[in-house]
């Protein structure tokens, strides 16, 4: 695997010098300063590429070229936003960048309720608490009909939890959910958030798939023409939330994408932490079935709790993800490609490290502190080395 590292640009507290010292050779980044939907110019792409290369690294993957909300709702100026997206892909290829991670999650990208969940060893992790989320949705957001998405027990527990929250607790929970986590391209006030949810009131899973198909049928032929590998990131969490449909959550969703546009440019980001939240997702089977279309991997693990919809970010080699079997399946796919004469490695980045050691005293991007990811990268690197030596060194 190609060892990469997500970097949020010049304002990231983790420097490119840090990235290189961690042992990564590739950088995963994006032009976050360009508004959603606008074309990434060759000039702006080359500026970022030069910064990365001056640090002795390469820009391996774009994460992400965000998709404008008008495309997801099939409203407004969606045709122009699609044309802009097509041009951005052409410009990236002109600059030598050919792997693009993206997602089709409506309104919110990845979602957590607690950004400082303290683990038994004193380090901090990200957590999604189903009951806290229900308390937010029913008692703070007050989304009409939200009760239908929860069990009677969850509704009662959410009411109890809300009753014990201070004003600061409520503000923090709201901020964590709607203000935008690292990599998210949108942040909202509560009123703005309600208005954006309203835009989806008539969009169910079938309609969102229909809108996604319009995007794929416009974008994938351009990607195929210019040589871009599109790698969709799964929903996080991989299930409907806030009354919004989610359509990249299961192996069935992956198959739907392939059936909709059967091009090798139409590929996947294997995010083990996102897919792995669902106990019914067999990660190794996903890799084996769709291996030739996996162009990027996010390796992390999560741990489901007593309520199976509550989870926290586990250490990379712990939790519900069998990281050994996952890495073995990825390495096997790389060797299959090599046997076909393809030498390209699959870019991998350690995802969502714990905040630990000296980083506990620093301001960090939630999930993206340096030391926790350094630990994760070293652990995954060791797993891969052992697999390569044991099975492929002859």
Swiss-Prot record:
Molecular function in Gene Ontology: ferrous iron binding; manganese ion binding; mannonate dehydratase activity
Class of the enzyme per the UniProt entry, highest EC level: lyase
Function: Catalyzes the dehydration of D-mannonate.
Keyword Lyase: yes
Organism: Shigella sonnei (strain Ss046)
Protein name per the record: Mannonate dehydratase
Keywords: Iron, Lyase, Manganese
Catalytic activity: D-mannonate = 2-dehydro-3-deoxy-D-gluconate + H2O
Family: Belongs to the mannonate dehydratase family.
EC number assigned by the record: 4.2.1.8
Pathway the protein acts in: Carbohydrate metabolism; pentose and glucuronate interconversion
High-level lineage: Bacteria, Pseudomonadati, Pseudomonadota, Gammaproteobacteria, Enterobacterales
Gene3D superfamilies given in the database record: Divalent-metal-dependent TIM barrel enzymes
Pfam family, any one: UxuA
Cofactor: Fe(2+); Mn(2+)
GO biological process, one term: D-glucuronate catabolic process
InterPro entries linked to this entry: Man_deHydtase, Xyl_isomerase-like_sf
């Amino acid at each position: 695997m190609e060892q990469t590292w997500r970097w949020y640009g010049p304002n990231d507290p983790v420097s490119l010098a840090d990235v290189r010292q961690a042992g990564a050779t590739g950088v995963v980044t994006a032009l976050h300063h360009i508004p959603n939907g606008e074309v990434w110019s060759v000039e702006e792409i080359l500026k970022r590429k030069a910064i990365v290369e001056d640090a002795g690294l390469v820009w391996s993957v774009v994460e992400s070229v965000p998709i404008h909300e008008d495309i997801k709702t099939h409203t407004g100026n969606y045709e122009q936003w699609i044309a802009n997206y097509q041009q951005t892909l052409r410009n990236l290829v002109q600059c030598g960048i050919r792997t693009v991670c993206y997602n089709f999650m409506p309104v919110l990208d990845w979602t957590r309720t607690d950004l400082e969940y303290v683990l038994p060893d004193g380090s901090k992790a990200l957590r999604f608490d189903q009951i806290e989320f229900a308390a937010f949705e029913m008692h703070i957001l007050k989304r009409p009909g939200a009760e239908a998405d929860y069990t009677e027990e969850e509704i009662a527990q959410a009411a109890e939890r809300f009753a014990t929250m201070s004003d600061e607790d409520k503000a923090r929970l709201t901020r964590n959910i709607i203000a935008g986590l690292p990599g998210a391209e949108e942040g909202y006030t509560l009123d703005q958030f309600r208005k954006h949810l309203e835009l989806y009131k008539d969009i169910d899973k079938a309609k969102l798939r229909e809108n996604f198909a319009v995007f794929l049928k416009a974008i994938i032929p351009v990607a195929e023409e210019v040589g871009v590998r599109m790698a969709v990131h799964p929903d996080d969490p991989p299930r409907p939330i806030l009354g919004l449909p989610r359509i990249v959550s299961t192996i069935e969703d992956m198959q739907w994408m392939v059936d909709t546009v059967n091009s090798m440019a139409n590929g996947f980001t294997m995010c083990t932490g996102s897919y792995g939240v669902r106990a019914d997702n067999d990660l190794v089977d996903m890799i084996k079935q769709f291996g030739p279309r996996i162009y990027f991997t996010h390796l992390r693990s999560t741990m489901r709790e007593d309520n199976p919809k509550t989870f926290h970010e586990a250490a990379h080699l712990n939790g519900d993800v069998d990281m050994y079997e996952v890495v073995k399946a990825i390495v096997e796919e790389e060797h299959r490609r090599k046997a076909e004469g393809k030498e390209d490695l699959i870019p991998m980045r350690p995802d969502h490290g714990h905040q630990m050691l000296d980083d506990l005293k620093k301001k960090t991007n939630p999930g993206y502190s340096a030391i926790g990811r350094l630990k994760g990268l070293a652990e995954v690197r060791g797993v891969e080395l052992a697999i390569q030596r044991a099975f492929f060194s002859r």
